């Protein structure tokens, strides 16, 4: 009886810790969101947001960009957390399935085909179709070959390598103007995002909300295939559904900002180190942390240089690569 009471007390204490942590993350998110609207080459404080200058810089330029950054950051972070549970691999991240490079191949092809003047809506649709094509191929392998998580992971890596090689070949044979545009896009950037691109943001948020509410299923999947099946989870159904959702999230994110690495790997690990182990609270925390984490990276990319902007993919890679190496050394058995 006493042991049961102790367990209940521990569960209650953990829930309080998780809710306090989510409250702190919410405050941090709102603070960074506020700073992102103010910051830029010209700082504009809230008392001038509705002036003529504020109408242009805050509401027409910065606000749609901030929304896109939040959507992409939340998407990649949630996708990373889902993949780490799905593949039972602590080093899994959105690019690992090859979905990012699959989307990139179509975008690179369209840029070359239209000599660098392809409309954004066409590039966006192409990125989504490329991501979904790779995802459907993975689903076909999974359905017909009944691949386990480890083998499906290796198939995704193979697709990523093949897609990356194909992109390199296309860039190599492009003209100098196309090459400059392609290389900048492949490094990740939110430059040029405005209200015309918000249909992609609107498409991302329902997926983010749905995935962030699947913590119970992911808790079961993280126990392993055998135990999840014993608990009544249909591995085939849920694994394929999650792979499809992750592919859609990553495809839309690539359409908005190009390839952005490491954020889907690093942030879920940091949250786990802070004591968030239950996916029912980890996933909402990933939404908040991914949003303000990529906003911070975007602030660095905008403010690091005068009259220039560092690609955000360079910022995330610079900050994330040392953490990835540390995780690689820390996780000794992840096969």
Swiss-Prot record:
It comes from the Bacteria. GO terms for molecular function: vitamin transmembrane transporter activity. GO terms for cellular component: plasma membrane. The keyword Cell membrane applies. Pfam families: FecCD. InterPro entries: ABC_BtuC-like, ABC_transptr_BtuC, ABC_transptr_permease_BtuC. The complex is composed of two ATP-binding proteins (BtuD), two transmembrane proteins (BtuC) and a solute-binding protein (BtuF). This is Vitamin B12 import system permease protein BtuC. It comes from Photorhabdus laumondii subsp. laumondii (strain DSM 15139 / CIP 105565 / TT01).
């Amino acid at each position: 009886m006493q042991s049961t009471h102790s367990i209940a007390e521990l569960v209650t204490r953990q829930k309080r810790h998780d809710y306090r942590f989510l409250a702190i993350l919410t405050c941090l998110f709102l603070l960074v969101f506020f700073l992102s609207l103010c910051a830029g080459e010209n700082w504009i404080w809230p008392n001038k947001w509705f002036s003529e200058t504020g109408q242009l810089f805050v509401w027409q330029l910065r606000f749609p960009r901030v929304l896109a950054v939040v959507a992409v950051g939340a998407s990649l972070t949630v996708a990373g957390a889902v993949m780490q549970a799905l593949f039972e691999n602590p080093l899994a991240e959105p690019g690992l399935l090859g979905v990012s490079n699959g989307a990139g191949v179509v975008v690179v092809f369209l840029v070359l085909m239209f000599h660098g003047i392809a409309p954004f809506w066409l590039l966006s649709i192409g990125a989504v179709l490329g991501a979904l094509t790779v995802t459907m191929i993975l689903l076909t392998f999974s359905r017909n070959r009944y691949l386990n998580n480890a083998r499906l992971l290796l198939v995704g890596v193979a697709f990523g390598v093949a897609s990356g090689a194909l992109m390199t070949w296309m860039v190599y044979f492009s003209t100098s103007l196309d090459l400059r545009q392609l290389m900048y896009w492949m490094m990740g950037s939110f430059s040029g995002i405005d209200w015309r691109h918000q249909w992609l943001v609107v498409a991302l948020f329902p997926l983010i909300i749905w995935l962030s509410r699947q913590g119970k299923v992911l808790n079961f999947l993280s126990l392993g295939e055998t135990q999840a099946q014993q608990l009544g989870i249909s591995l085939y159904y849920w694994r394929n559904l999650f792979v499809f959702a992750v592919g859609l999230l990553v495809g839309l994110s690539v359409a908005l900002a190009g390839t952005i690495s490491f954020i889907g790997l690093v942030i879920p690990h940091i949250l786990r180190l802070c004591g968030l182990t239950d996916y029912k609270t980890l996933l909402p925390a990933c939404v908040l942390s991914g949003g303000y984490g990529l906003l911070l990276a975007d602030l660095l990319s905008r403010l690091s240089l005068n009259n220039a902007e560092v690609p955000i993919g360079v910022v995330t890679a610079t900050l994330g690569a040392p953490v990835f190496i540390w995780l690689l050394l820390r996780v000794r058995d992840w096969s």
